[in-house]
């Protein structure tokens, strides 16, 4: 019994920390992206800088630090389930993103960490045959 209580406390602390990740504004940076088809087969690979900034209320996706090449919008729903902060788990986000000439897209973003790799999968509902998988090089909590 004496060993169980400390283990439960440690488990609760990790769970609280993992949930806290979802309440923070985070900037993810990627330098490698894969373009996938609807069967998750790689169609091409890019070595460009992509940043994805996520908060509880908004998403901003930027390509090569170009303010004219970004999508941004409001988070409609978010589900966060991490067992180990930024290492093992998943966040799924439903958002409405606007780009360029006010083109609006319903989007799904999945941030996932497993086997020592973290990536972000970006799917636009009006482009079901194309997904972008961005491998996260680094992340920074903001604010």
Positions of predicted regions on the chain:
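Short, exposed beta-strand-loop hairpins at the edges of beta-sheets
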Residues: 108-133
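Short beta-strand segments that buttress and anchor functional surface loops
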Residues: 61, 93-100, 109, 120-124
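Tryptophan-anchored aromatic micro-motifs
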Residues: 21-42
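Short, solvent-exposed mixed-charge patches
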Residues: 21, 141-143
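Short, hydrophobic/aromatic-rich segments at coil-to-beta transitions
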Residues: 23-29, 87-96, 116-120
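Bacterial Sec-dependent N-terminal signal peptides
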Residues: 1-25
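Contiguous, well-ordered beta-strand patches that form the walls/edges
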Residues: 65-106
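N-terminal glycine/threonine-rich, aromatic-flanked beta-hairpin/loop signature
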Residues: 48-76
């Amino acid at each position: 019994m004496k060993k169980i209580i400390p283990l439960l406390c440690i488990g609760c602390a990790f769970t609280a920390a993992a949930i806290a990740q979802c309440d923070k504004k985070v900037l993810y940076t990627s330098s490698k992206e894969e373009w996938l088809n609807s069967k998750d087969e790689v169609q091409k690979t890019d070595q460009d800088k992509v940043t994805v900034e996520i908060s509880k209320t908004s998403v901003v996706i930027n390509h090569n630090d170009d303010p004219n090449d970004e999508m941004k919008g409001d988070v409609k729903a978010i589900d966060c389930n991490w067992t180990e902060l930024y290492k093992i788990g998943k966040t799924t986000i439903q958002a409405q993103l606007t780009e360029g000439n006010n083109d609006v897209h319903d989007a799904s973003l999945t941030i996932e960490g497993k086997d020592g790799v973290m990536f972000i999968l970006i799917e636009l509902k009006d482009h079901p045959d194309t997904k972008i998988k961005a491998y996260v090089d680094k992340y920074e909590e903001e604010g």
